[in-house]
């Protein structure tokens, strides 16, 4: 149990996918202008990352390794992610049409989110078992969602702040992301791997 807690804390805070590994920057910058959109994208990404992580582990363990097809790992994981995203899109469309309209093009773009593929590949490279893969996928998604929501809240405040003209828009957003990354560096000694 302690191992899973350390994996969770380490993935969410110490090795955050957005601020440390720089994966998932496209939705991080694109969907974080409004808090409600960031929360919706965070929830959708959490569902996709967790499910894709587990499915990718199963495809690798039960199909690719026994058949000696490990060279098809990236292609197989992309196909798994595409299926999971399509399933998620159907669920979101049926359960919350308003959220589906808010997320717009970003929901299908989860397929090309490098964080999702990165989690799947890192699970295999770090030799995680089934449960560790599920925890790692959920933790990566929780870290992604946490950073997204924090960043969206800051960007909403910056939208009404008196920011100098040269720094308005994406300039102040990048500066804010850099400062958030520095703040998360404070968690570096929290968990030793």
UniProtKB/Swiss-Prot annotation:
InterPro entries: Ion_transpt_RnfA/RsxA (IPR011293), NqrDE/RnfAE (IPR003667), NqrDE/RnfAE_oxidrdctase (IPR050133). It is found in: Cell inner membrane. Pfam families: Rnf-Nqr. The keyword Mitochondrion does not apply. The chain crosses the membrane at residues 5-25, 39-59, 62-82, 102-122, 134-154, 171-191. It is a multi-pass membrane protein. The keyword Ion transport does not apply. GO terms for cellular component: plasma membrane. One of its GO terms (biological process) is electron transport chain. Keywords: Cell inner membrane, Cell membrane, Electron transport, Membrane, Translocase, Transmembrane, Transmembrane helix, Transport. Part of a membrane-bound complex that couples electron transfer with translocation of ions across the membrane. Belongs to the NqrDE/RnfAE family. This is Ion-translocating oxidoreductase complex subunit A. The gene is rnfA.
């Amino acid at each position: 149990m302690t191992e899973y807690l350390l994996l969770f804390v380490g993935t969410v805070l110490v090795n955050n996918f957005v601020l440390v590994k720089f994966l998932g920057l496209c939705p991080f910058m694109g969907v974080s202008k409004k808090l409600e959109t960031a929360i919706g994208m965070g929830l959708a990404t959490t569902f996709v990352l967790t499910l894709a992580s587990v499915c990718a582990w199963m495809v690798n363990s039960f199909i690719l390794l026994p058949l000696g097809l490990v060279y098809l790992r990236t292609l197989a994981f992309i196909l798994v992610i595409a299926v999971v995203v399509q399933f998620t899109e159907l669920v979101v469309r049926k359960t919350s049409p308003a959220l589906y309209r808010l997320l717009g093009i970003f929901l299908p773009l989860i397929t090309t989110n490098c964080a999702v593929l990165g989690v799947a590949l890192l699970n295999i490279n770090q030799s995680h078992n089934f449960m560790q893969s599920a925890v790692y996928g959920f933790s990566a998604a929780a870290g992604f969602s946490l950073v997204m929501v924090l960043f969206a809240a800051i960007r909403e405040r910056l939208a009404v702040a008196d920011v100098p003209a040269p720094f308005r828009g994406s300039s102040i957003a990048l500066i804010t992301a850099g400062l958030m990354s520095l703040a998360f560096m404070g968690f570096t000694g929290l968990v030793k791997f």
